[in-house]
Regions:
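The substrate-binding groove and active-site-proximal loops of carbohydrate-active enzymes
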Residues: 1-11, 51-66, 95, 136-151, ...
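Asparagine-centered polar/low-complexity signal
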Residues: 91-92, 126, 144, 230
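Active-site-proximal helices and loops of the catalytic beta/alpha 8
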Residues: 16-22, 33-35, 40-52, 73-82, ...
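Phosphate-binding glycine-rich loops and adjacent basic patches that engage nucleotide phosphates
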Residues: 29-40, 115-124, 145-153, 267-268
Length: 318
């Protein structure tokens, strides 16, 4: 599956380019998170992180689009045989404006006041320590994924997405959510309680963000979903388990993030070349067309090149 990540593009604008996306050989479109965020009026490109600071589990975002627009996009994309994948933020909520790792005042007070909904507000200071990663907060107030209330809200949101026609999900920061062998039943319960789509089919496209991780950790998460990760952390033996990328929006927007910003130094042409190489090795790939830092919400045209179209046509022989 060849996925294009149209992060920060409005749903109505995506609708206008669906035919082109199909022509370029992509199979699926990953859209931005649609949960309500703490600052919905911030539209500058360098405020990209606001989309990952939700205050609820609703499906409507002033910056990206409404649930009605999402349904329209799904219906139109399906006519072209394209899947729509929703990016969902389920690891944390928005923090206070002063940077403290405590819930934002716009989050429902009853939800905030229930201490069982939250993990420790201590920061993760050792990313190689799994106990810290799944029990502490990553600079934002982390959710307790064993909480029945938290799970019910996330399951309800996922099923609302499915009702609107969404075909799959990217789970943001999945690496920070514990696994069954670590005492967390989150992924088991989420998978079990996903409803079927309008055709009576189970959702088949689910992948979690597990970047900068060992093959062992990738293998452990792949028991529950496919794993979205940066290509240089993947061994070839993981082909069916992973969805690798050369550059994602994090790397492009923030050169200092996770030590991955080195791709900022690569030309668009080099990004395309490396992506083309990925498609010769992996059945599933993700391509992020860089957004222009000079023209807000305008994407560079690399995804429209012949090289991308030819790369997406590659079928790997086993």
């Amino acid at each position: 599956m060849r996925i294009i990540n149209l992060f920060d593009m409005k749903l109505k604008d995506i609708i206008s380019i669906v035919p082109l996306i199909k022509e370029q050989g992509f199979d699926a479109i990953q859209i931005s998170p649609l949960q309500t965020t703490k600052d919905e009026e911030e539209f500058d490109w360098d405020k990209w992180w606001i989309l990952y600071q939700p205050i609820d589990f609703n499906i409507s975002n002033k910056r990206i689009g409404s649930s009605l627009e999402l349904k329209k996009l799904c219906n139109f994309a399906h006519k072209y045989g394209l899947y729509i994948i929703a990016d969902i933020v389920v690891g944390h909520m928005a923090g206070r404006d002063n940077g403290e790792v405590y819930p934002n005042s716009k989050i429902d007070k009853e939800f905030v006041d229930n201490k069982d909904n939250w993990r420790s507000f201590l920061y993760v200071d050792n990313w190689d320590d799994r106990y810290q990663v799944i029990n502490r907060s990553m600079g934002l107030p982390g959710l307790n994924h064993n909480s029945v209330i938290v799970q019910d809200k996330i399951i309800n949101m996922i099923n609302n997405y499915i009702d609107l026609g969404v075909d799959g999900f990217r789970i943001d920061a999945a690496k920070s959510i514990g696994l069954e062998d670590e005492g967390c039943n989150f992924f088991n319960n989420i998978t079990y309680n996903m409803k079927r789509n309008s055709n009576g089919e189970l959702v088949k496209i689910v992948y979690g963000e597990v970047i900068c991780s060992s093959n062992d950790l990738i293998d452990r998460y792949s028991k529950y979903m496919k794993v979205l990760t940066n290509y240089n952390y993947v061994g070839y033996n993981n082909n069916d388990a992973v969805i690798p990328f050369i550059e994602d929006k994090d790397n492009w927007y923030d050169p200092n993030i996770n030590g991955l910003g080195w791709t900022n130094n690569l030309s668009t042409r080099e990004i395309v070349r490396r992506y083309s190489n990925l498609t010769r090795i992996y059945d599933n790939t993700l391509f992020y067309p860089r957004i222009s830092k000079d023209k807000c919400n305008e994407f560079e045209k690399a995804w429209l090149t012949d090289n991308i179209r030819e790369a997406n046509k590659v079928k790997i022989k086993r």
